[in-house]
Each structure stands twice: as structure tokens, then as C-alpha cells.
Amino acid sequence: ANLFASFFEKELEKDQIIISPLLEIKFFKRPKTLKQIHCLIFTSSNGVKAAGQAANNNIRALCVGDRTTNLASSLGYSAEKIGDNVEQLLKTLCKGKKIASEILHIHGKYTKGDLVNQLRDAGFLCNEWIGYDQVAQNLSLPALSAFENGDKIILPIFSERTALLLKKQIPTLDRSHIIAISSAVANVFLNVRAGSVSEAQTPDLAGMKSLTKKVLQNVLLE
């Protein structure tokens, strides 16, 4: 959240940027058996953080997105980007040469889809480890005040669960401009009265940054 907010410090005053995460990441203790696995799947940067530093540089990391891949590489993994989303990763792995060794998917407590069983059905030896929890949080007082005051608000939303939590806490978003990382996030707001709902061209940090800047410029001109 802090990294994303820093992209807009030139366009906005400090008090115009409100950081109020709706999810708190809590990492679990790593199992000792983790060091025995030589091929990991990371579908988010939090999965990489949960795994921590690679035991050696021969551990293969199959990653979703540039940010996840770069982080895995910086922590010593032999990291490969296998698509921009889980669907692309699954399709690429199923089309390519089968991986003979065990694969471990490291993900959070709340995850969409069933990647592990889909890979098993495709003939892979795949297991999973829940490396972290995503604990729901209430909006901060400054964030609530902004909604109550009727301010124009730009809301970059990076996950479907975050979107659902926001919708539950703030059912009316008619002064809010929602920046959705994916169609799944945008669809959460189909029946919500919002100022606007826009979907990033690519489901990653770069796509969200680009769209947020564009919407911000339009809102500032209103």
C-alpha cells in the first residue's frame, strides 16, 4: 500500500493520500519440510515472503506476474514468470514438458480457484502449503471520514476479497472512482452505485498505476 501510494505524491498533497488496508497479512511458521522441495509455485508476492530466502539457488520458482517473479529472484530462487494470472500459469504448465518432481504451491488462507487439484488432474505431483492469513480489517477513521464527508475518492482495489469487504463496509460509493485490477474485482461492483468503475489493462502493479494516474487526472480536472 505504501509503495503504491508513493507513486502519486507529486500529484497529491500528503493529507489527500489515505492508506487503509482492508487485509492484514500474517505469516505462518515455515515447516521444516519446505527445504526439501525443489519446485515452488508463487501466485503472489506474499507467497514468496512466506517462503523466505531460498535454501539454495537451484530451487525453481514458477511465478505469476513480474512483481512476484522479481521478488523470488531477489531471494535466491531460480524464478520464471509463467503468465500474468493463474489461468495462464495453469495453461502453460499443462502444455509444456511435465515436471517430474514434487511441486508445492504456497498461497494464503483465502484463495480463489483450485490450482493444486487442477494440476493433479493434469498429471503433476502437486501439494500446497498455506503460508499466511489475510485478516479482515475495518476502514481507518480518516478513510471513513472521507466517505462521510462526500469527498471524491479514488479506490485502487487489488483483490476480490478486498472489494467484497469494502462493499460490506461502504454500500454506497457514488462519489468514488474504483480502479479494479481484474474483471472479477470490477464485477463485485456491478450492482453498486459508484462514480465509475474502471478495469486495469493488465492485472499487475504497472497496469494499476497507469489506470490510477489516468483516472486521477480526469478527477482533478472535474
Protein language model annotation of sequence segments:
Residues 1-222:
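Signature of uroporphyrinogen-III synthase
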